[in-house]
């Protein structure tokens, strides 16, 4: 991604751009990916993404001059979008956890690992625990994707996504195959 999109003029939080994979939805998972940025602005991962107003995100930024009127970098954050609820101020996020003074290193590969299990979220950066949060606002399965803010060149590689949502054994493939065998294969 190299569009260098910031968001709306009125944004005091980094909105930028989002790209999501829409062929499948996930609830619980472990996602690992390598990220490389030519710029020092915001980037991260979104999950349980329903739309621009309902999702979670891991977001990190180096730049101390962005966003305008917002919190200065460097930092890493775990956030929940406040959604469409009555009385919610939009387009704001609620911060679940922050690691101030740390982000990524511009021009160097960074490895992220996001573990999402129910209402608990853990982020590791380069093999070290960075953020931890808990929230139950969005419980349903949603899309997973990337979010960028004012970046002029970001690359993601070596993506591994492991679905950890428990399978109902009554409808699992092996159970279903066992039932078919019982019904249709003579003893």
Question: Predicted regions: what is each one?
Answer:
Residues 44-46, 122-124, 160:
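Beta-strand signatures of extracellular beta-sandwich domains
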Residues 5, 9-87:
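Secretory/extracellular carbohydrate-interaction modules
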Residues 119, 124-147:
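Short, solvent-exposed beta-strand-to-loop segments that form ligand-recognition rims
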